Amino acid sequence: MESYLRKWCLVSVWVLLLGLGFKVKAEPQVPCYFIFGDSLVDNGNNNRLRSIARADYFPYGIDFGGPTGRFSNGRTTVDVLTELLGFDNYIPAYSTVSGQEILQGVNYASAAAGIREETGAQLGQRITFSGQVENYKNTVAQVVEILGDEYTAADYLKRCIYSVGMGSNDYLNNYFMPQFYSTSRQYTPEQYADDLISRYRDQLNALYNYGARKFALVGIGAIGCSPNALAQGSQDGTTCVERINSANRIFNNRLISMVQQLNNAHSDASFTYINAYGAFQDIIANPSAYGFTNTNTACCGIGRNGGQLTCLPGEPPCLNRDEYVFWDAFHPSAAANTAIAKRSYNAQRSSDVYPIDISQLAQL
């Protein structure tokens, strides 16, 4: 009887609170979210660097309340995933995070960054993958200090999600830029992918050694379909550049194999592959299904396909931004980012992820 009355009282209080307009705050699905990557997910880390690769000016952020350093008109994929995971706030950039903010996670991504150290050097300063991992190690030391000891910190960090999206610049701003880099003369596409994956694995093992256990590894998108690639290498301005996409697929296949190997090697961790390439190809092949009318031109850019010069300060963008797959010469629009993020979180097809999607990763 006493138990029944206690339950009845709890239900009554709950109904009363709802009736008075109080909202019960739900906890996020994971305690924290750590992000490693390049301009696709950079949210301001390059703002303070001496770099051409910056997006801290209008019209970037036109649908986000103003420029923040995000290379989009609005949200990036990780912004959407942050919402889907139940966080109240977007994950802060490493360059601005302070105090206990780090407990919800940190975004270390840096525009022009690559797996190889020299990648993107022609654009100026950037935080390479290894540099981002070093910054994470500094964060771990702060987490230990806040939580009191290494055991508590380790238990906390193992429940967080670690999103890694690296490799695009190793092609865009390295391998396919022979005027600045010699890698295309040193390596075949297969050899180059092997080199990248070897370096990638080393950094993932470093993250593992510092507490990371839930990894979402995002494959390279179809770079050969970007307005910049179309402007330079597509005769009709519509057909994707196969030599670039072919190299990207080789890398992605190696990445899938690495996921299998790492899952076999670390029974206490989970690694999953996010097929951004496949999702992107599906959007381009079936644009109307996602509400798009333009798949090959930048909403903000200059020249052929809007891809010869990327979005410049003060340049007026297109008005129907939600109908464009690409925001600028290289980066997806907020609408495309949303579509890709949703498929990463809750896979529509078995080919979207391997072996599990991010919603399942969060539940582990």
Swiss-Prot record:
- From what superkingdom does this record's organism come? Eukaryota
| InterPro entries to which the protein is assigned, alphabetical | GDSL, GDSL_esterase/lipase, SGNH_hydro_sf, SGNH_plant_lipase-like
Keywords (A to Z) from UniProt: Apoplast, Hydrolase, Lipid degradation, Lipid metabolism, Secreted, Signal
Tell me the GO BP annotations in alphabetical order. Answer: lipid catabolic process; systemic acquired resistance
The UniProt entry annotates the active site at 39, 328, 331
Kindly indicate whether the keyword Membrane belongs to this entry: no
- One GO MF term: hydrolase activity, acting on ester bonds
Q: What is its main location?
A: secreted
Annotated Gene Ontology cellular components are: apoplast; endoplasmic reticulum; nucleus; secretory vesicle
| Signal peptide segment | 1-26
The recorded induction information for this protein reads: Down-regulated by drought. Down-regulated by virulent or avirulent pathogen infection.
User: How is expression of this protein distributed across tissues?
Assistant: Found in phloem exudates.
Compartment annotation: Secreted, Extracellular space, Apoplast
Q: What is its EC number?
A: 3.1.1.-
Report the protein's function.
Answer: Involved in EDS1-dependent systemic acquired resistance, maybe in phloem-mediated long-distance signaling.
Q: Which family, according to UniProt?
A: Belongs to the 'GDSL' lipolytic enzyme family.
Q: What is this protein called?
A: GDSL esterase/lipase At1g29660
